[in-house]
Amino acid sequence: MTKRIITISREFGSGGRFIGEEVAKKLGISYYDKDIIGQIAEQSGFAPEYIRENAELSPKKGLFAYAFSGRDITGKSVEDMVYEAQRNVILKIAEKESCVIIGRNADFILKDREDVLNVFIHGDMPKKVQRICKLYNVAEADAAKMITETDKRRRTNYNFYTDQKWGMAKNYTLSLNSSQLGYERCGEIIMECVK
């Protein structure tokens, strides 16, 4: 297999992280998800805990609050500095090796590369709620709230930094419904596309 980069954007609870990890294992390529946080922290100078809480989900207080957030002398906000560090780390990883990258707007950051397969994993709300209840041991109402809030923050971040619409099929090579296809079949389809 020639070098391939697979980016997986996903709705919370759709199993995108699990699917990506399985694809990476089966293809024998690197997998980048939360472990990328250390590299982003090093590049940005912010603590890993701050990156973990804010990188993928900022601007977390909305665009109005973002407009009034602190800035450095170049006019960049803290969120912008974290995003720039994240972008640089993703570009370096893509240059280095075949891999699966979960989230972090990697699909947009790498969109001009010919060796990239951009995937969006989504699912039906009842199945996502069921998965989150099981993973986090929470009630259905709490799971639904977690899904709605996490996806809203991901959407805000993506739409702000990319000028594209998060989850819109035309922004991805593949858009797969894990509730209808199942996690295993989603993984098989992704692997068929990179052969």
Residue ranges of model-derived segments:
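Short, amphipathic alpha-helical "lid/cap" segments that border enzyme active or binding sites
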Residues: 87, 183-191
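Pre-Walker A (Motif I) flank of P-loop NTPase domains
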Residues: 2-11, 97
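Short beta-strand-centered segment that lines the nucleotide-binding/catalytic pocket of NTP-utilizing
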Residues: 30-41
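Small-molecule kinase domains that catalyze NTP-dependent phosphoryl transfer to phosphate-bearing small molecules
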Residues: 59-66, 139-184
